[in-house]
A protein has these predicted regions:
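The feature marks the mature, well-folded catalytic cores of soluble enzymes
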Residues: 1-109
């Protein structure tokens, strides 16, 4: 797959594309771009490994059902996440045509 073709296709579909050499650079970029906002998380090992919940929750209101407070309501938390200003998830796949593929059991991607 040619990354430049993917970039062009995503841009044509209205996405802003940024790429990074390392996962740490990507996490730092998101941490500087999202500030003072509500942020919802879809269940994602990738986001966990990037440490984004810890980074963003220091200066945003973050909703993640993987970080459910004691006695919290997972369904209510997912609803809050879905209506956040920013919603972060990881895609299952992407086509060179710019189509993003998400398959999810809970429908939160």
């Amino acid at each position: 797959m040619d990354f430049m073709n993917v970039t062009k296709a995503l841009t044509a579909r209205g996405f802003k594309v940024s790429s990074f050499e390392t996962a740490k650079e990507a996490a730092e970029y998101l941490n500087t771009q999202i500030d003072g906002a509500t942020v919802g998380f879809g269940g994602s090992i990738t986001l966990e490994e990037l440490g984004l919940y810890a980074l963003l929750s220091g200066h945003n209101t973050v909703f993640s059902h993987w970080h459910l407070p004691e006695g919290g309501d997972a369904a209510a938390l997912r609803a809050q996440a879905a209506t956040s200003e920013h919603y972060l998830l990881s895609a299952n796949g992407i086509a060179e045509t710019g189509e993003i593929i998400n398959i999810d059991g809970a429908g939160n991607r």
